[in-house]
Amino acid sequence: MIAWGGPKLAEAGATVIERSADDGAMGLSAISRIGAVRRHAAAIDRWCSQHRVAVHVPVDSPAANFPVAKRMKRRGVRVCHLVAPQLWAWGPWRLNKLRRCTDCVLCLLPFEEKWFRDRQVPARFIGHPVINRPLAEDTVARAAEYPAGSPKVLLLPGSRSSEVRRNLPLLLRALSEMQSRHRRLNALLVAANAELLQLVRSRIGDSVPSGLHLITGDLDAAIAWCDLALCVSGTVSLDVTRQAKPMVGVYKVSPLSYFGSRLLLTTPNRLLPNILAGRRIVPEFVPHMGGAEPVWQAAETLLADQARMRAATDALRGVLEPYRGHDPAEEAAQAILRLARGENPLSS
């Protein structure tokens, strides 16, 4: 297995030829990455000209992966997209391009299989590695080690440095407003890794708000600990969904990205649990270019009404139902192996 990727692929046993970018782009900000994407595609193509490839597995990021997949198909390589490109949210006109550069699409969201099949793209729903990952048995015990408080609020500012820079000030302002209304409030901020924790500390400086505790890792225990999460839009919202914890979702963007997203996105909901539910079960501000007021007000509306909190929990549990019984790693591996053997990758 040869990869362009990061350390987790290397840990899994892949030979990493070149490390891909750690910091992604969303919306119109991706335009700045066009040159890097082209260089990336050319480097992969040069490598493939000297090596025989059985199956190419592009993961997510259609802007980066479509050019590579197109070159692979020209070389006669079978292509299996792992993580369906979200053409249902934006860019349905790119379906013809997808049909030309894939043999099958493995979907992480339940509705995607039918959506793609209805448009003549071979697809299968395989579950989601976040939702179908079992919680460790000691998760609740670890959560009990965190500070007591009422309410307990979790801040999740993102897994990329660009997300943290944009969203951290907004989340801190929202937290400050909530602290002024709840004297016993305690908060955790979870940084995805040590580098991002250092970034958070540098942004906050010496004035860490009273009642805010900064940690890295141990996301599951932090979610189990909290009453409510303020989280950046993205996969982390599924980590919160997996434990059915009420949340408010936000994604701070520039004015250009905000108005561009309004033009390009075709779905009313952008936060993953709302997309999965097909309705607004979580307050979301995605994309958002305003201040913290609507964010903390949405959080306060939930915290002030236990019936709303219970309804949010029940709705999130409902979102999890289609995932029961799936093993995304096993199902993806079997589809890729079938494709490598020249068989139908979507057969049972």
Could you tell me what each predicted segment is?
Residues M1-S348:
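Nucleotide-activated sugar donor-binding and catalytic core shared by glycosyltransferases
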